[in-house]
A protein has these predicted regions:
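Active-site beta-alpha connecting loops in nucleotide-dependent enzymes
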Residues: 4-22, 31-38, 314, 338-378
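Walker A (P-loop) phosphate-binding motif
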Residues: 9-10, 24, 96-145, 255
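Short beta-strand "acidic-cap" motif of Rossmann-like dinucleotide-binding folds
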Residues: 31-36, 138-139, 244
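Acidic, Mg2+-coordinating active-site environments of NTP-dependent enzymes
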Residues: 41-49, 62-72, 77-95, 101, ...
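Short acidic-hydrophobic, aromatic-tinged amphipathic segments that line or gate anion-handling sites
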Residues: 54-58, 94
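Conserved motor-coupling elements within RecA-like helicase/translocase cores
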Residues: 154-156
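Switch II (G3) loop of P-loop NTPases
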Residues: 159-169, 329-335
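Switch II of P-loop NTPase G domains
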Residues: 168-182, 338-346
């Protein structure tokens, strides 16, 4: 990780990932500035409290002449006034993913959590297991974790946990973001068709995941969902050691659900007992992935158990907002049919015997298209 202070300017700083990265780099001692088309709370408050100067609106004069590098957000495209000025002046620029690679991940043990669903929960859970064990990990999470003050933290620990998104990187780099994250341990929770705005079909997504796994060194580890046929198809020609994790009898690390309550799930992995304060097989599998990754990092099962049982989850992941007149309101971020299905299955376990009403807002690019309409109806 780079140690000498730099001036880093973010174009599109108010996005969740860009803002979190900016704050974490500021905490390392870098001089950070940025701009965005709209600057408003809560991100504007977070950036201000971190001592970051933010300019509203995109103008060529916003570009600080003394900046060492300019970070171009994924939402920025040609025609943006600052981007056009940056290109004309031939100033050095990178994507956010490349900035993370250069300034944060290089030289560390990088644990990259990927997959269509469960990335944020699994990333946060693994980071918390490391934190609870006193490892002081760095992390980059695409959500708001309850166990940490923010979604990003960069430390001098050799452990770094990051959510590996298969979405593209920037207007000038159409590779998936996870190609930049130097995985020593790669987790693939599941693979389904998503991001219809950039992938033509499932085969295109699988190709991106195969190329991602090709980055894992021979002394690393690949963990895949052994219950997912698409994940199992990734085994062929994978150059790194690979283990399957799942409930099926053929899995290398076999999960068995031993008990469940409305608040937690007890399970075993090849006979070793664990507990996670979340409901559903889906979350038991997420937790089992974390167990395997933490073991690879050198943690004992007792350290892992202590981290798991104290995990508090993510905001907007089956988050209870309150109860009025006997009606409990739950907020969840899931938008893919499988994520919705698993969320409802978990809620039926958590609120057994109660009637469920589901209100769905199609906000993602894929959910607003007709490619998944039949699955959404089901």
């Amino acid at each position: 990780m780079a140690t000498h202070p730099k001036h880093i300017h973010f174009i599109g700083i108010c996005g969740t990932a860009m803002g979190s990265t900016a704050v974490a780099l500021r905490a390392l001692g870098h001089n950070v500035s940025g701009s965005d088309s709209q600057v408003y709370p809560p991100m504007s408050d977070v950036l201000r409290d971190a001592g970051i100067t933010v300019t509203e609106g995109y103008k060529p004069e916003n570009l600080p002449p003394d900046a060492d590098v300019y970070v171009v957000g994924n939402a920025i495209s040609r025609g943006n006034a600052e981007l056009e000025a940056l290109l004309e002046k031939k100033l050095p620029y990178v994507s956010m993913a490349e900035m993370l690679k250069r300034e944060v991940i290089q030289g560390k043990r990088s644990f990259v959590v990927s997959g269509t669903h469960g990335k944020t929960t699994t990333t946060t859970m693994l980071a918390w297991i490391f934190e609870h064990a006193g490892k002081n990990p760095g992390f980059m999470i695409g959500g708001v974790p309850e166990n940490f003050e923010s979604g990003a933290r960069f430390t001098h620990s050799d452990l770094f946990v990051i959510e590996g998104d298969e979405y593209d990187t920037a207007y000038f780099d159409k590779r998936s973001k996870f190609f930049h994250y130097l995985p020593e341990c790669a987790i693939v929770n599941n693979v389904e068709f998503d991001h219809a705005d950039i992938f033509d079909d499932l085969d295109a997504i699988l190709l991106s995941f195969r190329r991602f796994l090709n980055l894992v060194p021979r002394n690393g580890l690949v963990l895949i969902n052994g219950d997912d046929p698409n994940c199992l198809s990734l085994r062929e020609k994978c150059p790194a050691p690979l283990k399957t994790v799942g409930l099926g009898p053929a899995c290398d690390l076999r999960i068995q659900i031993t008990a469940a309550t409305p608040e937690s799930t007890m399970f075993s992995i090849n006979g070793d007992p664990f507990e996670v304060p979340m409901v559903g097989e889906f979350n038991a599998r997420n937790a089992a992935m974390c167990v395997a990754a933490a073991r690879f990092a050198g943690l004992s099962d007792d350290e892992i158990r202590a981290g798991l049982v104290s995990f508090r989850g993510i905001r907007r992941r089956q988050q209870e907002r309150g109860t009025t007149n006997g009606v409990t309101v739950i907020d969840d971020f899931g938008h893919h049919p499988t994520a919705i299905r698993e969320t409802l299955r978990g809620l039926r376990q958590r609120y057994e015997g109660r009637r469920l009403w589901a209100l769905f807002e199609p906000r993602s690019n894929t959910s607003r298209r007709n490619v998944l309409q039949d699955e959404l109806i089901d």
